[in-house]
Each structure stands twice: as structure tokens, then as C-alpha cells.
From Swiss-Prot:
Stretches of the chain found on the membrane's Cytoplasmic side: 1-411, 472-496, 555-684, 751-813
Superkingdom in the source lineage: Eukaryota
Residue ranges the record marks as coiled coil: none
Annotated organism of origin: Arabidopsis thaliana
Similarity comment text for this entry: Belongs to the SYG1 (TC 2.A.94) family.
Skewed-composition ranges (Acidic residues): 230-241
Described function: May transport inorganic phosphate (Pi).
Subcellular location: Cell membrane
Protein name according to UniProt: Phosphate transporter PHO1 homolog 3
Tissue: Expressed in vascular cylinder of roots, leaves and filaments. Expressed in receptacle and stigma apex.
Keyword check for Cell membrane: yes
């Protein structure tokens, strides 16, 4: 794989704009190549023409630069002014560039051969190279500042956690003074990092105050109640051997350490300055918030609270470690990219610019700072002791989860199950045609009873396949869907796993259909009609059991994630609304017919109609009432979620979004009323009017708010500025399909009847079209969300911390 593709694949998706623009710099190099070719092919001043048989390298590069007779080894070595951060050259022969540092513009390169023919192209290249270098260095510096501040906060959290442990497990206390050597170690690292950051900042541009770092607290490295002190001696020995690299203006570590030792409070004093930050969202806490009941923030020293605090802080450390890993990767990739692009430049121009420029890169904050590495080491040590019971292997498996490998057996199983589905569909069609089942007596009863039962599995399988297609294209266009949904790293399913689940359900459902038809045709088993009717119920019960199975089989983390989001949707607005919750709520709005099929299951089997294959459900007022209710449950859930967000965020857009779902609820109720009472003109007119209004509103919201399109001032007219799919026509096709598929409801109002198609078949087709429309919506909705994250450089999740420090005490410290 070429470096450009490898570079793009290794980027943090949300930081794409902050990386070096490698592709654009390559285009500038191509312009230099084009100019050289054009120059070398032009006739010389003496009338002689360049011979076509000359060596390409000599003709294209060396003849142009005038370096053919100047061997590289004769060039004088360039000198460095380390103090000023300037790359100096003794003469033009000693190097083609001069790199210096300015307070206002950062790094600037002077191209010393701009007067040569074609030098303006190389001058443009170095100007853009400087812009990219300054951009990358500034971004990296900013992110390191952020993690240093977060590390200081985690220090305080660990102080409180250790004091909490002492209070819970050893109320009499312990000898705090004996542990001060270990407690100051991380604080020393952070103070050194802050000093190095400050010293490496150009004059007048320092954004970090050294004094603010002097009071950073240290993570106490003492053994927890669960972990022994087996590593204490080793760490003390490492501490003596550890050296700190501090630039000019750095804080003296010993002074800082002694200052912190003197200022460090005892464990009891620490607990007196903190309160529990109860971030767990429950219906009870929501109701208390509405009633303005004060939250319980006093510390209760119980093992249950200790476990909650440890789990919360454990998640915070895991997320913090992931930030450090991404920053480390960011620094390494960009330094490597600068090296690669400069080597390409040297190869094209036969100059020697890589060495002097890379010396500047290596000596810059981007290439020389080791704050991230030191923080990673300290986080690892802390996590091993306090959250992994001194088990390094266990801790590293948590901090560095292994990437999921694509297994051949999954691919084989997916392909095999897909082939089985195709074969069973062919067999089903053949049986229906050969036995002429559509013309047999009882065909209408079968379509009114068994077809709705089995169509439920069809809706589920279709939605799963559509979701698998979404995952495939999200990965193809580098939409970070696992981060957006909040999947635990290493547990997200790929499209092959999702397809395997869908095709497996499809195989079982089709086998049940064929078994049912076969038993219907066999005179020996036809008498056991009640038993044959129960096959779909058995399959549905088996699916439910697998879904709620607590054992670690069949993708347990994904199943529990789905059940959690589903419960949050049903319990709206008692839970804080997150993107996975309202995303699943939108999926449910496209599965209204499937939800009605579940209602039919309850009626058909609960009231005993399956014994006679005769449905009396529609004759029941209770069934008809719930026929209304179940259809609007997903929309009511989304409406309540919008109201919850409107109440919390005070964002009027959520009110308009809620109005959209309210109009949809009215339209669905009117269409349902008309489907029950055919021939009522009033119901028909009202259903058509409200359905049209709701469809227009929903379509506009899809395009403008959910997809971010229809922007007239965009550089991509009527779309948006940033597009992940390079073919613009895809967006216009998607908008047209969205409109056509959304208006599929029109058949319920205009009573389209086809002699060759049963009404239940028409209902199933319309429901399937809505599922397909939802799949199209899914891709562009997450694309827009991903681009919003990219615009805000949002690559991390915010993890709430378990303790809140008093503000007054923080200011004093």
C-alpha cells in the first residue's frame, strides 16, 4: 500500500483536517515535475534540441538544477543555531533552505534558490509545507495542554478515591507520610511536561502558565485494598533512575515536589473538600430533578459506593489513555509524513532539503516532546495497581483492546447462510407454483393469518440487511460509527456479523414456512393443524430468549446495548437522550407494521384463534384500540425525547422536531381510522391532508437538519460544503428516493387494489419500502453527524468524574 493511502487509513477520522495535507503537497510536487518536463522538452537558446535518448534522471532533474557537476559529498555541512531555533547555511551550496522561527508566524522557510528557473514552484511548495507544519504543531500543542489539565484533574480524583478506600476499609487511617514518595511521582512528570511545553513555545506565544502546574496533585500509588505492594520496591528503584528532560525555564522538580508534599492534605481533609458527583441517570433522578428535589451529594462510606466510584474512575482512565494513544499516533504519523514528502521533493529536484528541515521538525514540540509517553507510562502504572489488582496483562488488555480480526469462518458462515436463504426462497416459490397454492381453498384464510405472522421475520431480516449495508458504507467512507454510537472498543459488529444474524433468522423463518406448507399438504399431518400453526410462535420465542440470554454468547455486548437503548426509548423521557437512543427510536418508526404484527401474535395465540386458523381479532374493540396505540408508540417515544431535550438544552429546534412527530402521530391515527372504517369520506380526506402535511415537514427536516443538505450558499450547490461521497449525484438520487418512498403511504388512502396481489402483500411491500428508505436515511444522518464531529475535532467521549471538589478550595490551591 502506498504511504498516502496508509496515512489516510491511520488518521483519527475526527482530526482529518488537523493532519498534514499530504495529497495537496504531492500535487505541488507534480506541478514541479510538469514544469521540468516542459522546460526540458523546449529548444535551447543555441538552437540545439534535447536528445530523446538522454537519461531521464539527468535530463529531468540534474540538468535543470545545475547540480550535475557538484557532487553532494563536497557540500559544506550546515550549522544549527539551537538557541534561536534557526537552520543556518554557510552558502547556497550547503543547503537549499533556511528555516527559522518567528513569534507571530511560527516556522518559516526561506528557499535560497528561488531565483532559478522554476524556483517559484518550489517556493510555493515550501510555503505550503510551513503552513502544514505550523498547523500540525499548533494542534498537537493544544491537545497536549488539554491532556495535561485533565491529568491534573485525575490526580485529584485519585487522591479522593484512595482516601475513600481508606475510610471504607480502614477507618482508623494509615501512615500517609510513608507514601509521599510514590504520591509525588506523576505530579513531577506533569510539571516537567508543562515546563517543556512552555519552554518550547515561541516568545510571546506561550499559552500555558508554569505557575498553574506547580499545584498539580500526584496520583497516590499506594496499594489498594485489593492489590498488594509487590511493585513498590521496583517503582522506587525506577524513580531513582528516572531522568527528566526540562528545557529553559522548566520548573525544578525537587522544589515542586517538596512544595506539594508540604501542601498535601491528609486523607480526611481531602474527603472534607469533595462531594459525590451522582451522574447515573435513572427515572427516579429525573423525577427528582423535575420536582427540584436536591440531590444527595454527601459522602456515604459504603462498599457499594466505593465500587461505583472505582468503576466511574476506571472508565475515565480508559478514555484518557485512549486520548494519549491517539495523540502519540498523531505525532508519529505527521513526522513520518513530513519525512516522506521531503524525500519525494529531494528525489524530484535532486536537492538536499530533507536533512535540514527534518532537524527542525525533530527539534520542534511535535517531534521532541515526550509528555504523552510519560503520561502513558504513569497511567499504565496507576491502572495496573488500582484497577487491575496488580495484574499487568489484565490491565493492558483493558487499556489496549485488540482490534477484532475478520475471521474466515464468519465470512464462510455468512455466505453459506445467504445461499441457504436464496435456495429456500426458490424452493418456496416452486412449491407455491407447482401445488397451485394461490388458487386452493383456504388461501385467503392463510394470507390473513399466517402471512402476518411470518412477515414479521421478513421485516426484521430486511432491516438487519439494510443496517449491514449501512455499516459497510460507513466503513468505506470512514464514518466513525462506533464512536458516534458509543460502542465499546472491540465489541462493535462488522457488516459480516450483522449479515450472519439476519440470514440466520431468514433461514429459520423460511424453514418454518416450508415445514408448515409441507405439513398442510401431507394428509397424515394435516389433522394436527394446531401444532403446525404454532411454528412461528416457537421461532419468535426462541429469538426473544437468545436476545435476553445473559451468557456471553451470540454477541452479548451488542444484544445488551440494543436492549438498553430499547428500554430508554420505551421509558422516554425519564432517561437523558443520547444519539443511540433517538437513532433506535427513528428505526422503530419505520417498523410500525412489525409492531402491529406482534400485536397480532398476542391476539391470534392468546385468544386461541390458531386452533381454527380463523382470526377474530379485527372484530374486537380491544384489538382495534391497541391497533391505534401500537402504531403511534414509536412516534410518541420520539416526541417525548424531543421534549426532554427541549427542556434540558433550551434548543427551539427540538420543539420543531417534536412538532414533526406530533403531526405524524395525527396522520397515522387518521390513516388507521380510515383503514378500519372503509368508505368514510371524512376520514379519507383528513388522512390525506394530514399525511401530506406531515410528509412535507418530515422530508424538509430530513434534508435540511438530519442530512445537512439544501444549502444554497455551499460550494457544492444545494448540498453541503463537505461531502464524504465524491459523486454528488448520489445525494440528489438519495433525496429523490427519500421523497418517493416516503409517499408510499398514499396507497392506504387511495385504496390501490391489484387483482394479482392480496392486500396483506401490498401492506408488506409498503412496509418494506419504508425500511429501505430508513436505511438510506441512516447513512446520510450519520455522515452528517460525523462531519459535525470533524468540524469540532471531537474524537473523545466525555466521561463524568465521580468526585466534585469545592471551588473555593480549588482556587486557594
Amino acid at each position: 500500500m502506498k504511504f498516502g493511502k496508509e496515512f489516510s487509513s491511520q488518521m483519527v477520522p475526527e482530526w482529518q483536517q488537523a493532519y498534514m495535507d499530504y495529497d495537496f503537497l504531492k500535487t505541488l510536487l507534480k506541478e514541479i515535475i510538469t514544469f521540468k518536463r516542459r522546460t526540458n522538452n523546449a529548444p535551447s537558446h543555441g538552437g540545439a534540441k534535447t536528445g530523446g535518448g538522454l537519461n531521464r534522471k539527468l535530463t529531468l532533474y540534474r540538468a535543470f538544477s545545475g547540480l550535475v557537476s557538484t557532487p553532494r559529498h563536497k557540500r559544506s555541512n550546515s550549522s544549527h543555531d539551537v538557541e534561536e531555533g534557526v537552520q543556518l547555511t554557510g552558502s547556497m551550496r550547503s543547503g537549499p533552505i533556511l528555516v527559522n522561527t518567528t513569534a507571530s508566524h511560527g516556522y518559516e522557510t526561506t528557499f535560497l534558490m528561488a531565483a532559478e528557473e522554476g524556483g517559484e514552484y518550489e517556493l510555493v511548495f515550501f510555503r505550503r509545507l510551513d503552513d502544514e507544519f505550523n498547523k500540525v504543531d499548533k494542534f498537537y500543542r493544544k491537545k497536549v495542554e488539554e491532556v495535561l489539565k485533565e491529568a491534573a484533574m485525575l490526580n485529584k480524583q485519585m487522591d479522593a478515591l484512595i482516601a475513600f478506600r481508606v475510610k471504607v476499609e480502614n477507618p482508623d487511617g494509615w501512615r500517609w507520610e510513608e507514601r509521599t514518595v510514590e504520591m509525588t511521582r506523576l505530579a513531577s512528570d506533569i510539571a516537567t511536561s508543562a515546563a517543556a511545553l512552555s519552554a518550547s513555545t515561541p516568545a510571546g506565544a506561550k499559552s500555558m502558565k508554569v505557575r498553574s502546574q506547580e499545584h498539580m496533585e500526584a496520583i497516590q500509588e499506594g496499594g489498594s485494598s485489593r492489590a498488594g505492594l509487590m511493585e513498590d520496591d521496583e517503582e522506587d528503584e525506577d524513580e531513582q533512575n528516572e531522568t527528566s528532560v526540562v528545557s529553559t525555564g522548566a520548573i525544578d522538580n525537587e522544589t515542586t515536589t517538596s512544595r506539594m508534599r508540604g501542601a498535601r492534605p491528609s486523607p480526611i481533609d481531602v474527603l472534607g473538600r469533595v462531594k459525590i458527583n451522582n451522574t447515573k441517570e435513572t427515572p427516579r433522578s429525573t423525577i427528582k430533578g423535575v420536582l427540584k428535589v436536591s440531590k444527595q451529594t454527601d459522602l456515604k462510606f459504603s462498599r457499594e459506593n466505593l465500587m461505583k466510584v472505582e468503576e466511574s474512575l476506571k472508565r475515565a482512565f480508559i478514555e484518557f489513555y485512549q486520548k494519549l494513544r491517539l495523540l502519540k499516533s498523531y505525532s508519529f504519523l505527521n513526522v513520518l509524513a513530513f519525512s516522506k514528502i521531503l524525500k519525494k521533493y529531494d528525489k524530484i529536484t535532486s536537492r538536499d532539503a530533507t536533512k535540514p528541515y527534518m532537524k527542525v521538525v525533530d527539534s520542534s514540540y511535535l517531534g521532541s516532546s515526550d509528555e504523552v509517553m510519560r503520561l502513558m507510562e504513569r497511567v499504565e502504572a496507576t491502572f495496573i495497581k488500582h484497577f487491575a489488582n496488580a495484574n499487568r496483562a489484565k490491565a493492558m488488555n483493558i487499556l489496549r483492546p485488540k482490534a477484532k480480526r475478520e475471521r474466515h469462518r464468519i465470512t464462510f458462515s455468512t455466505g453459506f447462510s445467504a445461499g441457504c436463504v436464496f435456495s429456500l426462497i426458490v424452493a418456496l416459490v416452486a412449491i407455491i407454483r407447482t401445488r397451485n397454492l394461490l388458487e386452493m381453498e383456504g388461501q385467503k384464510e392463510y394470507m390473513n393469518t399466517m402471512f402476518p405472522l411470518y412477515s414479521l421475520f421478513g421485516f426484521i431480516v430486511l432491516h438487519i440487511i439494510v443496517y449491514a449495508a449501512n455499516i459497510y458504507y460507513w466503513r468505506r467512507y470512514r464514518v466513525n460509527y462506533s464512536f458516534i454510537f458509543g460502542f465499546k472498543q472491540g465489541t462493535e459488529l462488522g457488516y459480516r456479523q450483522v449479515l450472519l444474524v439476519g440470514f440466520s433468522i431468514g433461514v429459520l423463518a423460511l424453514l418454518c414456512v416450508l415445514a408448515n406448507l409441507d405439513m398442510e399438504a401431507d394428509p397424515k399431518t394435516k389433522a394436527y393443524q394446531a401444532r403446525t400453526e404454532i411454528l412461528p410462535l416457537i421461532l419468535l420465542a426462541a429469538m426473544f430468549i437468545v436476545l435476553v440470554l445473559p451468557f456471553n454468547y451470540f454477541y452479548r455486548s451488542s444484544r445488551f446495548f440494543f436492549l438498553t437503548c430499547l428500554f430508554h426509548c420505551l421509558a422516554a423521557p425519564l432517561y437523558k437522550v443520547t444519539l443511540p437512543d433517538f437513532f433506535l427510536g427513528d428505526q422503530l418508526t419505520s417498523q410500525v407494521q412489525a409492531i402491529r404484527s406482534i400485536e397480532f401474535y398476542i391476539c391470534y395465540y392468546g385468544w386461541g384463534d390458531f386452533r381454527h386458523r380463523k382470526s377474530t381479532c379485527k372484530e374486537s374493540d380491544v384489538y382495534n384500540t391497541f391497533f391505534f396505540i401500537v402504531a403511534v408508540i414509536p412516534y410518541v417515544s420520539r416526541l417525548l425525547q424531543c421534549l426532554r431535550r427541549l427542556f434540558e438544552e433550551k434548543n427551539p429546534e427540538q420543539g420543531y422536531n417534536g412538532l414533526k412527530y406530533f403531526l405524524t402521530i395525527v396522520a397515522v391515527c387518521l390513516r388507521t381510522a380510515y383503514s378500519i372504517q372503509k368508505g368514510q369520506v371524512a376520514w379519507r380526506v383528513l388522512a390525506a391532508v394530514f399525511s401530506f402535511i406531515a410528509a412535507i415537514f418530515c422530508t424538509y427536516w430530513d434534508f435540511v437538519h438530519d442530512w445537512g443538505l439544501l444549502n444554497r450558499t455551499s460550494k457544492n450547490r444545494w448540498l453541503r460544503d463537505k461531502l464524504l461521497v465524491p459523486q454528488k449525484k448520489v445525494y440528489f438520487i438519495a433525496m429523490v428516493l427519500n421523497v418517493l418512498l416516503r409517499f408510499a403511504w398514499i396507497q392506504t388512502v387511495l385504496d390501490f387494489n391489484f387483482s394479482f396481489m392480496h392486500r396483506q402483500t401490498m401492506v408488506a411491500i409498503v412496509a418494506s419500502l419504508e425500511i429501505i428508505r430508513r436505511g438510506i436515511w441512516n447513512f446520510f444522518r450519520l455522515e452528517n453527524e460525523h462531519l459535525n464531529n470533524v468540524g469540532k475535532y471531537r474524537a473523545f467521549k466525555s466521561v463524568p468524574l465521580p468526585f466534585n471538589y469545592d471551588e473555593d478550595d480549588d482556587k486557594d490551591n
